[in-house]
């Protein structure tokens, strides 16, 4: 893929997601069926607004179906899926579009994830696949339907080296991606970007620092909090590094706002929230629930949850949610205060799309008021 980004002065090549691969393979197979000519390349629009030109690795027509494949290209940010073959078998049907997973595609066995009970092909890739075959159908004046089965040879073996089995996705990998594009960014480049943004805010005269974890946080702030977003700094998973930089640059107070699915880890003092670094979310919630008086059956069920929202629902049903979240807030602030050695006020707000604001650490309300006055004054 000939698209590049620059990170810390380094030119890095972008790649495309497994979702884009599945959509491209599906498009190639549908085109081969409808035209009788297997394509060598396909053009695929992505949610990012970028049209990809993806080579087709293989294509075979057999009667009423075709099987095509593409090779995953992760660019200069390769992961475990880089170089894998993503296949799609497309069969013509009377009407409608059905999408399923075959060999090497996991099945979602637990609630709370995208596509529960179905193949682990997430919502955006499913939409991309459906749009791709619909477009070629319109071009070829075809009015029937498609049955599409996505597969990844060796996907089951690959999945054993991921978090899929632990998350309740069994038998293979997931087809994922929200933009269709993989933009490479090394950890050091991310931290450098965070430090640069913090330094800029300090040089602009900001005395307070509002850290967000990403797009979810910023969307939530826009809807629910009294802050101007142009002064926020996104720290992604790197809460610890962002706090260290804030102290270095002399910020007088720090507030962190993020989804509880990440931020619950603060209750165990985990300052890098990437899943590859540490988890501990359910362990934290079990501890908070225990201290809040939740019954043993509820606590056992929490240990089996995949998502924090599912665990929160259990605590709510047990009548222990409010107290559990209060305890989580105190634990999180204890570790945050230890991180800054109590040198500046620091607090956090944790939310979920389903439940709204769940946690305000003890210092949070005061920080919200002070930062709101500074940012909006």
Q: What residue ranges belong to the model's regions?
A:
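Surface-exposed flexible segments
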Residues: 85, 224-227, 361-367
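Generic N-terminal targeting/processing segments that precede catalytic cores or assembly contacts
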Residues: 1-161, 165-167, 364
